[in-house]
């Protein structure tokens, strides 16, 4: 009798566990789409005479593509990555993240590695799902700064069918 009860108890708990999956799938920006977004964003900034770096990351903030234009300052490589990383991991434009953290009393989120509050990072969406992000750095403040960078990022995303 003890064996039968133990077997029934095991089956009662094992069956639901077996029905659960131990894997998951995630949708992310493809390399081809990342190249297209980066190229179109760079072209948009060039059209306005800006020399920038464009970085596209996947949904988890891992770098897919980086394009540094001739004449773009060296620091723009790191800053464009931080903008794209922030937009991908927080699922919002980096400027919006910057606005939100101004209201925080805890500065911890701002001190995380690769996070920035500067404008210029924009999520790439497929429907409502964030599948990546593009970050641009290099437009001087006198020419619109991060806000201009964000406009170039949006132009790059708009050129690609996702």
List where the protein language model places each region:
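Flexible, solvent-exposed loop/hinge segments and secondary-structure transition points
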Residues: 20-162
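Sec-dependent signal peptide recognition
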Residues: 1-8
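N-terminal signal peptide c-region/cleavage motif recognized by signal peptidases
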Residues: 9, 14-16
């Amino acid at each position: 009798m003890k064996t039968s009860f133990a077997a029934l108890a095991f089956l009662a708990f094992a069956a639901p566990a077996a029905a659960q999956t131990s894997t998951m799938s995630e949708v992310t920006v493809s390399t081809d789409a990342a190249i297209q977004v980066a190229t179109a964003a760079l072209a948009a900034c060039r059209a306005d005479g800006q020399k920038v770096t464009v970085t596209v990351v996947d949904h988890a903030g891992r770098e897919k593509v980086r394009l540094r234009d001739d004449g773009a300052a060296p620091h723009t490589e790191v800053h464009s990555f931080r903008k794209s990383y922030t937009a991908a991991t927080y699922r919002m434009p980096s400027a919006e993240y910057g606005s939100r953290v101004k209201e925080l009393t805890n500065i911890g989120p701002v001190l995380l590695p690769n996070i920035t509050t500067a404008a210029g990072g924009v999520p790439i969406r497929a429907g409502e799902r964030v599948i990546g992000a593009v970050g641009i750095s290099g437009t001087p403040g006198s020419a619109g700064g991060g806000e201009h960078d964000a406009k170039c990022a949006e132009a790059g995303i708009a050129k690609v069918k996702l």
